[in-house]
Amino acid sequence: MVKNIIWDWNGTLLDDTRINYEIANIMLEERGLKTIPEYEQYREMFGFPVIDWYITMGYSFETETYEQVADEYVTLYGRMLPGCNLKDGAKEVTCELRDRGYRQIILSATGQDTLEENIRKFGMTGMFEELLGQENDLAFGKSERGRQYMQRCGMNPAETVLVGDTDHDYEVAQLIGAGCILIDSGNQSRTVLEKCGVPIIHSLRELLVIFGEHVK
């Protein structure tokens, strides 16, 4: 019986995948590297660890550090974030699941301060029991952050499902012992996600059917 829902943020509840694609191309063009011609190609390519994805795109990190590249991404992301919205149904679904008695937290690779600021900006304050971001914006340590929280709070992995949009979310779920559901409208394509062998949804509203009416 599922009682706990761990949400990924970027690409799952927040519809920011297209600006990630745009930022990737801005940064590639600045460096004279080949840009990604199609949005769907980006969704086939994107992966974790993010530093490896940068290397796949052609970054060498000989004249700049990963930290410098990550800082530039965060700056561009902050400028473009006002053009983003929540995923269709995000507020409706999280409100309904909260009212049904599900315990909900967010586990994100985003820095803690950035995550908290984004939650406020999009009117999601108070929706979740805990916001678990990272110490910085380098996109490391998501699984360990989740594992520590679950141990501290006595959250039973067998009663927990992680909802995310990447194969990395699946890997995190495996490492913390939780179930996993993936949404195919985020940073990775359905083709990539199908390799994980877990349920895949297209709309967040499908979760209202998947999860029971009330937590028992």
Language model regions located:
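Conserved phosphate-coupling serine/threonine residues in phosphotransfer and NTP-handling enzymes
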Residues: 12, 108-110
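A short, structured active-site edge motif that brings together acidic residues
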Residues: 42, 124-140
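Glycine-rich phosphate-binding loop signature in dinucleotide/nucleotide-binding domains
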Residues: 100-102, 153-159, 214-215
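Conserved Lys-Pro-Asp/Glu-containing loop-to-beta segment of HAD-superfamily phosphomonoesterases
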Residues: 4, 142-171
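N-terminal helical cap/lid subdomain that shapes the substrate entry/recognition surface
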Residues: 2-88, 92
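Conserved H-loop
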Residues: 34, 124-129, 156, 201
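Short, acidic loop-to-helix structural element flanking the phosphoryl-transfer center
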Residues: 78-106, 116, 143
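Acidic, Mg2+-coordinating phosphoryl-transfer loop and its flanking beta/alpha structural elements
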Residues: 161-200
